[in-house]
Amino acid sequence: MAKKSMIAREVKRKKLVKKYSAKRKALLDEFNAAKDPMERLEIHRKIQGLPRNSAPNRVRNRCWATGKPRGVYRDFGLCRNQLRQRAHNGELPGVVKSSW
């Protein structure tokens, strides 16, 4: 189980990403459309002025059951250990043990 503070930090990051996504997208579109280097520099400074944790690449996928940050399957949102355990218990519909 991950520390509660780490899980809370990720929740906070997700909220910040959602809050600033429109503003960040508008600034990035403006940045890509600008031709003048000085104008681009000005827009870049505005982007840098946004909170660091509002960037979507800082959000880490975590297991919703344990909060573990590694070995998380996107389809289920579970880490590999929980996926195996829940699949064996029949808690994941459509998941069957492979045999050939």
Swiss-Prot record:
InterPro entries: Ribosomal_uS14 (IPR001209), Ribosomal_uS14_bac/plastid (IPR023036), Ribosomal_uS14_CS (IPR018271). Pfam families: Ribosomal_S14. GO terms for biological process: translation. One of its GO terms (cellular component) is small ribosomal subunit. It comes from the Bacteria. Keywords: Ribonucleoprotein, Ribosomal protein, RNA-binding, rRNA-binding. One of its GO terms (molecular function) is structural constituent of ribosome. PANTHER family: 30S RIBOSOMAL PROTEIN S14, SMALL RIBOSOMAL SUBUNIT PROTEIN US14M. Part of the 30S ribosomal subunit. Contacts proteins S3 and S10. Binds 16S rRNA, required for the assembly of 30S particles and may also be responsible for determining the conformation of the 16S rRNA at the A site. Belongs to the universal ribosomal protein uS14 family. This is Small ribosomal subunit protein uS14. The gene is rpsN.
